[in-house]
Amino acid sequence: MHPAAEHSPLGKSSEYIATYSPEQLFPIPRTAKWAELGVTAQTLPWQGVDYWNCFELSWLLPSGKPVVAIGEFAIPADSPNIIESKSFKLYLNSLNQTVFTSLGALQVCLEKDLSAAAGKPVGVKVRTLAEVEAQGVVALPGQCIDALDVAISNYEQPQPELLRCNPERVVEETLHSHLLKSNCPVTGQPDWGSVVVQYKGRALDHASLLTYLISFRQHADFHEQCVERIYLDLKNLLQPEHLTVYARYVRRGGLDINPYRSTGPISPDNKRLVRQ
């Protein structure tokens, strides 16, 4: 478990406060997990963003009438902190009986509080239900590798030694899988995800990638660190000209988390998959 997470509200009984309470937000430094991967804030081998989508966002108009919406938050991948997910939920719930005079006032409040917790400016969009409904759901790009016939029996830790490639052949391709699963390092609850791998580099053996992703099944870590581990393991193997790893996790507690890590400019979309 991340030492800071032991003091977070995650996995503990909590009082749900219905009026504005920014102190609910609990930042967790990224540095400890980066150290496990052998990187520092000064040597990060990726650019990226963590998209958080909130489906339980509500507040009051000055008339007392409630409003509901969907919040989209973009936390830079090089921010000093992640925000612990239950504390994020408690903070958002604290807006439920809080009056905002306008959508702009709400957005300014969210940007201020979330940026303070993350340690870097956080992008905020508040979207109407009709807007999100019209967008619908999308399919992941590239080739799905889930139908490949693989065998695996060890799910306790990610196993990069399972990955194989052809060093004599360079390809550019996009692969995806819906079989990513890990566990919350605090509560042990399952985190279900889909992941896209886009790269140009040594030809990756598709079956070995699928087996490697499945090896995360009982691994305990936060969403962001799982994606960073996948990114680094693939980068070390493929020596790619470019590499992107983008995971879209299933919603829990009204929030879904979608980490994106890439060698190139940050350009992901934030469109829902069928399980989101």
From Swiss-Prot:
Pathway(s) it belongs to: tRNA modification; tRNA-queuosine biosynthesis
Active site: C184 (thioimide intermediate), D191 (proton donor)
EC number(s) from the headed UniProt entry: 1.7.1.13
GO molecular function terms attached to this record: preQ1 synthase activity
Catalytic activity: 7-aminomethyl-7-carbaguanine + 2 NADP(+) = 7-cyano-7-deazaguanine + 2 NADPH + 3 H(+)
A biological-process GO annotation: queuosine biosynthetic process
One Gene Ontology cellular component annotation held by this UniProt entry: cytoplasm
Binding site for NADPH: S85, K86, R252, G253
Binding site for substrate: I83, E84, S85, H223, E224
InterPro entries xrefs: GTP-CH-I_C/QueF, NADPH_dep_7-cyano-7-deazaG_red, QueF, QueF_N, QueF_type2
Signal sequence segment: none
Compartments reported by the entry: Cytoplasm
Function description: Catalyzes the NADPH-dependent reduction of 7-cyano-7-deazaguanine (preQ0) to 7-aminomethyl-7-deazaguanine (preQ1).
Protein name per UniProt: NADPH-dependent 7-cyano-7-deazaguanine reductase
